Amino acid sequence: MYKILFATSEAHPLIKTGGLGDVAGILPIELARLGLEAGIILPAYPACKTHLKNLKEVARLRLPAALEPVRILKGQLLEGPNPVWLVDSPAHFDRPGNPYLNEQGQDWPDNAARFTTFCRAVATLANSPEFDWQPDLIHCNDWQTGLIPPFLAPLRSRPATLFTIHNLAYQGVFSRQQFDALELPSAWWSPAALEFYNQISFIKGGLVFADWLTTVSPTYAKEILTPEFGCGLDGVLRGRSKRLTGILNGADYQRWDPRHDPFIEKRYDQTCWSHKASNKLALQRRYGLPEDDTLPVLGFVGRLVEQKGIDLILGALPKLLAEKIQVVFLGEGEERHQNALQQLASRYPNQIGVSISYDERLAHGVQAGADIFLMPSRFEPCGLTQLYALRYGTVPIARRTGGLSDTIVDATEKNLRQELATGFTFTESSPSALLTAIQRALACYAQSRQWRRLALTGMAQNFSWQTSAKAYFDLYQQLVSQEFSCKNNVL
């Protein structure tokens, strides 16, 4: 059976900052269940070393622009069948902060060098006869792995490459000075290669040189071909549109299911949906709000940035707070949004609760305890939290974009009658459009029988990773059966 090497900058439970970590944590496991040999390779952050068993050195690589040899460590997940390799370069990865930011929340100034070293190591290892686990395909993810396809592209015999765009807005763009310092091929400094408005774009390396591209939802695959969502790369993507597929991310129902969630006050399912009220009371206690299980509680879990529509929520709140509702927030992000929320919580202590952090336990508590989940993203490649909300019977309100369009059925009168509706959607990216959608939801909430049917329809949806993994499995088979060599003469 084929060997797939999943190259990523984060993977749960080793290290996670967002949705990529969730995907990298579950997709290789699901691929293994389908019979593939699926390994994972990522940088050797300190946290990764503590979460692996049987960790040992299997190779040492001397790479251009690296002052010291790079060690390759191999280990095994504590749970799961997948082998894991770590690219151990202490000067690049053994440091505090998260994979991309320092403790002050700023980009590491040497991110270009850090992830060039990672990409060089993966490309060298995967095509080395000394490596005892030769992959048939390397599955690259986001800009941090964007140099792997161009490193491999000119080789006569090499693994196939697949590049997944999780969020096109994050591109790994660096200066010409950094490009020169990295000792990269001079031919890469070209509009046909990695040059991007007189800078180098790591993500463009993946977009131009990978054998196939995927995004994390069918709608986002269409959106990024347009100037509105293409982030300056829509022309490149239109040129590769015949080799671009949208595969919807799945939800990890082992971790996110109210039937067996260890983090919530009272477990429940569709047959005992009334137990959700106990979780609402627990959530109100956690945020110091008056306990009243008849009040509609709206929840937001996510980064406090404009992409996630936090400014739309802030714009809608003054009118919204005239209603008998409560709103809870969990997340961190731009300081101005954090301050605005904290000021509102001080002004409306009985209606607004704020936690400026990311707390996994509390995230589960919000999903279980809220009635309505707010997700007014300006763009959303896929989104996972709306999938969790559906499973927990927490009705999502979302802007009709990306994966939100693919996973939420709007509660029109017709869809409600046919018991197809799962949430409320809106199109215009404005506080007034969001407010209208919330008011629609509150009107439905007042009709308890209709609301219960709506929530239970959402709970019955199945966005499991088995479906997504099978789509990747089929695509891998197609790519591995083809032969690739010297695909781009600019190299």
UniProtKB/Swiss-Prot annotation:
The UniProt keywords, alphabetically, are: Glycogen biosynthesis, Glycosyltransferase, Transferase
Say which domain of life the source belongs to. Answer: Bacteria
**Does Cytoplasm appear among the keywords?**
no
User: What residues does ADP-alpha-D-glucose bind to?
Assistant: 16
Please cite one Gene Ontology biological process associated with this protein. glycogen biosynthetic process
Glycosyltransferase among keywords = yes
* Function comment: Synthesizes alpha-1,4-glucan chains using ADP-glucose.
Q: Please give the PANTHER family that the UniProt record associates with this protein.
A: ALPHA AMYLASE DOMAIN-CONTAINING PROTEIN, GRANULE-BOUND STARCH SYNTHASE 1, CHLOROPLASTIC/AMYLOPLASTIC
Instruction: Kindly give the NCBIfam families that the UniProt entry links to this protein.
Output: glgA, PRK00654.1-2
Know the name of this protein? Glycogen synthase 2
Report the source organism.
Nitrosococcus oceani (strain ATCC 19707 / BCRC 17464 / JCM 30415 / NCIMB 11848 / C-107)
The gene from which this protein is expressed is glgA2
